[in-house]
């Protein structure tokens, strides 16, 4: 299996790295980071990730994954990226996203008539792209799998491994990375979190949204 994870400046690192850690542990699966231009990109907070190939070098993939992050905004009108996604989608077994990455799939026209999810703060905008937004950790509709925010990418990736390699392999990978969540708080969804916590998160997002998007220059 050949997996291409699209990375870009101001991505949410966990959106890419979480699924990467799951899928790279499957025997004979090759996972690589790709970007508009080969080389380093800087995630939110400054973490550097290296794209081994530029998207114009990638004609096909078994799986393509689009992470989320504040860097998604310019991608929604970036025809170079959107055209590439449409092209590579014709070759994929699975087209996937994490968090706000589903908006990019939508902008590429890949979610029309499909059930899809994403970060809880961007579910409604998915309607603008013809998608049917739903909640949940991940949603599979045809060959498209969209995951909710950040850590949901791990759940989605384990589901994908189970679909392709079987549940035993997926369980072995889960144990290998010791993915056994037991958080100290039960506030991991807006339905569970107290209203004041929901509003605090919204204020954090609004503040971060003012951060200029890096061009990588």
Language model regions located:
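Positions that flank functional sites
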Residues: 39, 120, 141
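Active-site-proximal catalytic alpha-helix in oxidoreductases
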Residues: 100-102, 146-158
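Extended, subdomain-level signal for the structured scaffold at the beginning of enzyme domains
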Residues: 1-95, 102-107, 123-125, 133-135, ...
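Structural detector of well-ordered beta-strand residues that form the stable sheet scaffold
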Residues: 95-96, 117, 134, 145
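Amphipathic alpha-helical segments enriched in hydrophobic/aromatic residues interleaved with Lys/Arg
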Residues: 136-150
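Alpha-helix boundary/capping and short turn/kink residues
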Residues: 116, 150, 163-167
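A conserved active-site-flanking secondary-structure segment within enzyme catalytic domains
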Residues: 111-138
């Amino acid at each position: 299996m050949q997996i291409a994870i699209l990375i870009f400046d101001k991505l949410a690192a966990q959106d890419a790295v979480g699924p990467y850690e799951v899928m790279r542990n499957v025997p004979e699966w090759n996972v690589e980071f790709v970007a508009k231009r080969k080389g380093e990109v800087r995630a939110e907070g400054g973490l550097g990730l290296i794209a081994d190939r530029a998207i114009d070098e990638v004609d096909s993939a078994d799986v393509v994954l689009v992470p989320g992050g504040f860097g998604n905004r310019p991608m929604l009108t970036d025809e170079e990226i959107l055209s590439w996604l449409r092209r590579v989608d014709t070759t994929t077994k699975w087209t996937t996203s994490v968090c706000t990455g589903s908006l990019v799939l939508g902008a590429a026209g890949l979610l029309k008539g499909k059930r899809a999810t994403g970060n809880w703060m961007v579910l409604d905008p998915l309607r603008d792209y013809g998608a049917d937004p739903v909640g949940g950790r991940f949603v599979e509709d045809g060959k498209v799998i969209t995951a909710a925010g950040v850590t949901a990418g791990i759940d989605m990736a384990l589901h994908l491994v189970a679909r392709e390699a079987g549940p035993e392999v997926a369980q072995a990978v889960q144990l290998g990375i010791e993915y056994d969540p037991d958080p100290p708080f039960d506030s991991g969804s807006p339905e569970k979190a107290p209203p004041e916590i929901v509003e605090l998160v919204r204020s954090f997002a609004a503040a971060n949204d003012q951060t200029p998007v890096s061009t990588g220059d």
